[in-house]
Structures are given as structure tokens and as C-alpha cells.
Amino acid sequence: MIKRKDMLGLIDATAEEISEILDTAANMKKLLKQGIKKLPHLGGCTATILFYENSTRTRTSFELAAKYMGASTINIAASSSSVAKGETLVDTGKTLDAMKNDFIIIRHPMGGAPYLLAKTVKASVLNAGDGMNEHPTQALLDMCTMRERFGKIEGLKVAILGDIKHSRVAKSDLFGLTKLGAEVKMFAPETLIPKGIDRLGAKLCASREEAVEGADVVMGLRIQLERQQAGNFPSLNEYAEFYGVNEKVLSLASPDAIVMHPGPVNRGVELTSAVIDDGKSRIEDQVLSGVAVRMALLFLLEQFRKSGK
């Protein structure tokens, strides 16, 4: 059983914890595919979704996951809350805790914000993305999708291409995949590669062709213009021509390879429309995996809370 109150990142998660989450998520996904969307496990619980950044997939996915498990949900947008009046994250957390929330699901532009909140509250805190730091549930849903397709993570060759420097997804994927025994290759323009990423277990490649060759999974990452200054690459068109994944590049991957992207996708930039719409694409399946993974996490964290350990 997972022995933690919160899910803040995969940097400190064990392989055993990740595997337990994926096992539980696989069961949740089977139920969803059967049309079962009402479970009693979190009856009487309340989950507050506290987002300081915009989101469609993650916010909706967490809300559905909580409701499918029987919990009540509250959505708080920072722009329309007391945060807009200057309330600090710590004080917001204390307020939500005083209302006896069971879960606080937070997305924040500052790296480390979920850790600060978790130290303040009794509720379980789930990191839905903190700055350029981590996005653990996205990595878990990525691994859930991979494992469903290949039956394992160990030994898989995963190519990650795109804006690695500004991507919290890339870091969480790297932590999780390497802990479960996958080989991770990365490629991006030099201006979009963070210093030291190779020391975390990634193999940096000199070309997109080198990264994709023989890969079981080809993952594109969104160019995050909102987190960077101009000048990291000449233009989106030139990025697509020299760094994006098209059908010719994809043909270098394993014959059974799948294509993934955390979304939202810039069609024709990170991936061409032909690649996105190819039968190898698992982008829509990732969305369903996201609901299943978040259902699993809420369930497992509540089990630990109930144990009183």
C-alpha cells in the first residue's frame, strides 16, 4: 500500500509505488471501458480543485475522477478567489483545511508550491503541475498507456522530443520511466535542453532521427511559448521542419511503435497532422488513462489516510 498522504512528484516515488498506482489504474480503466462511472469508495469526501493556471484536460480529468469515485468537488479559479485580493497560498490552504477538505488538487506556476501547501494542510495534496518542476499524474497516465499497449515498461525505448527545458511533463516522465527500467532518449534544439538532464538518466541525441530510430514510443512535447522568451528557435515553421515528427521520421521507429503527446498539440509543429491521426497515435487514449490514474491515486491516498499511519 502507498504510504504517503500526498502525491507531489515522481522524483521521490519508488518503483513499487508507481507500479501499485499503475496496477490500480489498469483496474479503474477497465471499469470505465465497461461504462461504470459511479463507485462508492470516496463517498463523503470532498476534493477541491485549486488552479492558478489554465487547464482543460487536467482539471476536467481530476473532477471526473473524483466524482466517479463518489466524492464531491469544488472548483476554485485563483482569478476569482481571495487570491486575487492578495491571499497567500498558505492562508488559502489553511482556509480549505478548516472546511475539512479531504483532497486539494493544485496547479501553480511556482515550482514547489504543492510541497509548501502539503506542509500546511491535513488534506491530501495532489500536484497537477507546478511551474517547470513536475506533472506526476501526466507521467503516470503516460506510463499507464504504454503499459496497456506493451504489457510492461521495463525495456521500452521511449523517445521524447520537443520543449524539454520548459516541460514539467518531461521531467516526471523521465523520473517514472527510468525507475521502471525504460530507456529514455531526448532531442530538442540546444536552446530547449535543460542543463543536467542527461545526469537524470536521459540519453541526449544529436538528431530527431537518432532519437526516434527503433523507439517503441515517440512522444512530442508542446512548445511552451508562455514560459519562454523569443529567440529559442527562428520560427514555428522552421521548428516543424527541423525538429518536428513527420511520417518520414516516424518510419524510423519500431514497427509497433505508438505516438503520444501530453496535449494540447500544436498541429503541424511538434507532430504533423498525419502523425497525430495515424493509427499509431494513442493521444486520445492518454486522456482516458488520465481519468483512470487520477481515480487510482485518490483511492490509494484515501486508503492510506484511513489507515491512520
Label each PLM-derived region with a short phrase:
Residues 197-274:
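Rossmann-like adenosine-cofactor binding region
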Residues 123, 181-183, 252-258:
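A short helix->loop->beta-strand "cap" motif at the edges of active sites that frequently abuts
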Residues 36-144, 267:
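Phosphate/diphosphate ligand-binding glycine-rich loop within oxidoreductases
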Residues 1-60, 64:
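Positively charged, low-complexity intrinsically disordered leader regions
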Residues 42-47, 154-158, 256:
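Phosphate-coordination loops involved in phosphoryl transfer and adenosine-cofactor binding
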Residues 52-64, 147-221:
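Glycine-rich phosphate/diphosphate-binding loop of Rossmann-like nucleotide-binding domains
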Residues 256-257, 262-309:
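Adenosine-phosphate binding glycine-rich loop
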